[in-house]
Every structure is written in C-alpha cells, then in structure tokens.
Amino acid sequence: MSVSLIIPTFRRPDGLKTALNSVFAQTGVEGAVNIIVCDNSPEGSARAEVERLTPGAGQTLTYLHEPNPGVANARNTAVKAARDPFILFLDDDEEAPSDWVAKMLSAQQAFDADVVFGPVTARLKTADPKFRPYFEAFFSRFGPAHSGPIPDYYGCGNSLIRRALLSGDQPFDTNRNNCGGEDDKLFYALKQDGARMVWAADAFVWEDVPESRATLRYTLPRAFAYGQGPSTSAMAGTPKKPLTCAYWMLNGLVQAVLFGGAGLALYAAGSKAAARILDKAARGLGKLIWFHKIGFYGTALLRPNPAGR
C-alpha cells in the first residue's frame, strides 16, 4: 500500500534534514512512500535543502511552498497534493526509526483504522535538572502499552489518516493558524462521525526539544492552550454544545483554584513538583478561558524572537 508522508516545516533546516533522512532510511514498506515537504516560511527557506536532498531520496520527494503563515495552511496545501489512500504526518522536529512507516501501516491494516497515532519520545538538549522529568513528559506522548482501538485522539505529529476522510479544500481549520489546535478540531469531528481511531504502541518517533522550549515560560502557556481543547471543541461542533462547554469551564475553574495556589507555593519552596502542579492549573485555566487564544504559529512566528524557536 502506498502512502503520502507530509512534513510541514517553518525555518527549521536542521530539524527538517533530520526528519527527511529518517524517512529516506525506512525499511519493510511494500508500497511507495511519497514524501511531501510543505514550506510555510514566506521566503521559502527550505527549498534549497529539499532540492539538495532530492537526488538521494530513493522515494518521490515533492517540495511545496505555502507562503501564507499558519500550520493549518501548510497542512491543507500538502493534503491537496496527496494522492495515496493514507497520509502520514511527521513534524520537522521529529525523527523516525527505520521501521516507523511499516509499523504505522501494520497497525492500520490490523485494526482497519481510519486514524492511527503513535508514541512520541522527547529528546531534550538541556533543561533545569529539577524540572527535567516534567519537560520530558510534557513533550512526549504516551498511550496504552498495547496496540488497538482507542476512545480518544492525540495530535497530528506521528499520525496516519485515511485520505478519504480529509474532504474539501480546508480539512484543517484555518482559523487555528496562529493558535494551533487545528488537528484537535479535525480529530474531534472525525470521532463524532464514527472514525475508528487506533494506537500503534510500537510506532514511536523522537521529538527534539530546543533549549528555548524547555522552560516554564514556554510550557505553561502551551498547557493553557491544551486545556482549552475540551471547551473549544464543545462550541466548535455542529450543533454547539453550551452545556458541555459550561461543564468543562466549571471543571477548569475548580482545577485552576485547587492547583494554582499549591503550584505557586511549591515553586516558591523550590520543589520539583511545582512544574507539574502549575501545569495542571494552567490547563484548568484554559478550560475556563477557552475563548482567549495565544499565538504559537503562523504570524506569531514572524515576530522577532518568537517563543520556543
């Protein structure tokens, strides 16, 4: 079975090179792996690197330029060019083991999955030793010990999606270009429509975390944004679910109050548990203030010294 493998990228040449080289090294795949790199930098900064690597790719390697900033724009442009029955997504800060594609496809076939997710193992270059376990967990993705159907969904990096489910020109919501969460909205809708979601326990990838991201200044706003997911999803569907949203807002208020004070006290005391507790408080606050979006992508990355880059 052939598969389209999409790598959206934004001004991350070293990460893109690592991701591509790991894809070139894939083994055990019976069908074609058609690679699509979608460059989301306005200046098209990845073009030269992709053209340099193309002769040694061993697979079809297509470069696309989506100059309009936004992760949803980049994903949508790449999806339009995908012609295979399934699409794999790998981020430009991820590296895949040589059997990754084969294991993702194997999980799809074993469970007749519409969507497959795999684990992510964070690799930190440096971090405050006191909070290192928290940062490793924050940037990693964990799931069941064994492969099989799951009731929930994860993020787009290290996922496989049935191409037929990505209908229209904009399967990823472009209103989420700057704040992210376009994948959450898509997967929520697919789940509501009965899509079969599966976990591939052995199909992991590594994610490289730069020093600029291994800080509470970066992770707590991200935790806030992650916390917004349930409330936002309740109001984004058709029909809207205000009672469900109200439930999550109340849940978030309690969470923010309970963990906020405790987290600040632990941080003042120098406890290594502070980061984990403050993270819970931030996620609770996100459930409550779900309508206030923080920019992490798109035009936010065009500002001088954007967070986490």
Model segments located where?
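A conserved acidic beta->alpha catalytic loop
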Residues: S22, I36-E49, E94
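Non-catalytic, C-terminal membrane-associated alpha-helical segments of glycosyltransferases
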Residues: P221-A225, T238-R309
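Acidic donor-binding loop at a coil-to-helix junction in glycosyltransferase catalytic cores
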Residues: N177-L186
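Glycine-rich, basic loop-to-helix element that forms the pyrophosphate-binding segment
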Residues: E66-A82
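Short, flexible, basic/aromatic active-site loop/helix in glycosyltransferases
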Residues: G118-P119, P133-D152
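Short, well-formed alpha-helical segments that are part of the catalytic scaffolds
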Residues: R12-A25
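Conserved donor NDP-sugar-binding/catalytic core segment of glycosyltransferases
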Residues: D99-F131
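Short aromatic/hydrophobic "clamp" motif used to bind/position activated sugar donors
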Residues: I87
